[in-house]
A protein has these predicted regions:
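Conserved nucleotide-sugar donor-binding catalytic segment
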Residues: 148-214
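Short, well-formed alpha-helical segments that are part of the catalytic scaffolds
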Residues: 17-31
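Short beta-strand/loop segment that forms part of the nucleotide-sugar
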Residues: 37-47, 68-73, 98
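Cell-envelope/extracellular polymer assembly enzymes that use nucleotide-activated donors
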Residues: 6-9, 40, 191
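Short aromatic/hydrophobic "clamp" motif used to bind/position activated sugar donors
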Residues: 93
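Conserved donor NDP-sugar-binding/catalytic core segment of glycosyltransferases
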Residues: 105-138
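A conserved acidic beta->alpha catalytic loop
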Residues: 27, 45-54, 75, 97
């Protein structure tokens, strides 16, 4: 992979997802922002014993300028995400689970919103929809939080919380100041998101794109 800079980097920890990871990667490749010019994927194989690693290696060979493949001994999702941070070359970063996916307009809408509000926020989030076994809005996307794209000041609108890392995008400069805590077995992503929001007491919501949560 060259020293090229990207608009968006996506870090995907990979473990036992050979049935789903190709669909996840394809949802990033098909982004209407233009994958080869503007998007980087960092695939971190967390010592997966199934065929996930082979699938990831094939994609990295197909898109050598855009996809970085990294192998590590199994250490958990937090360590895998922290490992992925060492390879990012994008202005904004998403941590995507390896069995989820994005709507095709997600990256372009998020990038434009960030550029319009760059000095105000470190984080932008999108609504989530359940798919496959269950369908409908994710419990964290119910209510009127995503009724319109806007900047939320949590000091004024403290009821509009955001906890889910995979539906969020973070400025890479801000992201590098915080690591995921590998000692936490649950809720490590919520802690990470909250730390990012508290830096400015504001974050953005974009109403149109959808993060699909399996």
């Amino acid at each position: 992979m060259t020293g090229k800079q990207f608009k968006i980097s996506v870090v995907i920890p990979v473990y036992n997802v050979e049935l789903y990871v190709a669909e996840t990667i394809e949802s990033v490749i098909r982004q209407d922002i233009g994958f080869e010019e503007n998007v980087q994927i960092v695939l971190v194989n967390d010592g997966s014993p199934d065929g996930s690693g082979q699938i990831c290696e094939e994609y990295a060979k197909r898109y050598p300028e855009n996809i970085q493949y990294v192998y590590q001994e199994n250490a958990g999702v937090s360590v895998a995400r922290n490992t992925g941070m060492d390879y990012i070359k994008g202005k904004y970063v998403n941590f995507l689970d390896s069995d989820d996916k994005w709507s095709t307009d997600a990256f372009s809408k998020v990038y434009d919103f960030f550029e319009a509000h760059e000095k105000e926020i470190n984080l932008v989030c999108c609504k989530q929809e359940l798919f496959e076994a269950k369908t409908g809005p994710h419990r964290l996307s119910r209510g009127d939080k995503f009724a319109a794209s806007r900047v939320i000041n949590i000091l004024d609108d403290y009821q509009y919380t955001q906890f889910h890392i995979t539906a969020s995008f973070i400025k890479s400069d801000a992201m590098r100041l915080t690591l995921f805590d590998p000692k936490m077995k649950y809720g490590e992503d919520a802690v990470y998101v909250i730390e990012q929001i508290l830096d400015k007491h504001k974050y953005g919501v974009v109403s149109e794109p959808t993060h699909y949560y399996r």
